[in-house]
Amino acid sequence: MPSPKRTFLDRELAHLVKHAYANAPAVKRIFDDAGVKPTEIKRVADLARVPVTPKDRLIQMQRESPPFGGFLAADPQRLKHIYLSPGPLFEPQGADRALDQVAAEIFRIAGFKRGEIALNTLSYHLSPGGWLLEGGLQRAGVCVVPGGVGNTELQVRTRSE
């Protein structure tokens, strides 16, 4: 019998696949070209049947159909951020902050405590790294000083004060 966590993951995955197929033209095209129906993806184990899109192909698709290559399965007006990661790849971020919760749990396990102050030196420039750390730290109750990269002497002085 599957664990409650596995049952939850399977159910969420099946929902996500059906949603992406119905709302993201590129996902529908990839599934159809491979002869895979979204209803066939019911469990995490079924992911092996999902066609993989290589990074080079994804970049090409984003150039042909900017900015997301037909992979956006949400209303563009509901996006919170658009990141540009190395590749270059455009990455949308909606209002869902599930990654913040995951990052917060990791920070708690690492020993961060509510009320502490953290200097975030990851870049906030176009990539999601700085924002992901900030969201997780804030969710864990930590106050964030958004340092980013550069200004090393000022950041060292800020840290020591």
Regions found by a protein language model. Name each.
Residues H19, L122, G147:
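Small/polar loops that bind or transfer phosphate-bearing groups
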Residues A74-Q77, A98-V102, H125-G129, G147-N151:
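Short secondary-structure boundary/capping elements
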Residues M1-I109, K113-G115:
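Nucleotide 5′-phosphate-binding alpha/beta core
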